[in-house]
Curated annotation (Swiss-Prot):
Residues 1-20 form the signal peptide. The keyword Signal applies. Its main location: secreted. The modification Threonine amide is found at residue 60. It is found in: Secreted. Pfam families: Cecropin. It comes from Trichoplusia ni. GO terms for biological process: antibacterial humoral response; defense response to Gram-positive bacterium; innate immune response. Keywords: Amidation, Antibiotic, Antimicrobial, Immunity, Innate immunity, Secreted, Signal. The keyword Secreted applies. This is Cecropin-A.
Amino acid sequence: MNLVKILFCVFACLVFTVTAVPEPRWKFFKKIEKVGQNIRDGIIKAGPAVAVVGQAASITGK
């Protein structure tokens, strides 16, 4: 009977600690996602400029 009470208390403490863990302050994957979005936005913004440079190079024959 005592073993059952001890195991129940240990299990209850384990469940409490797992559910009471706060969120981490530094969200690693959010930072990676933001870097990826910035790279994607930079590529989208640079697309027209690269196309113009390509057309200019083809006009001059280089």
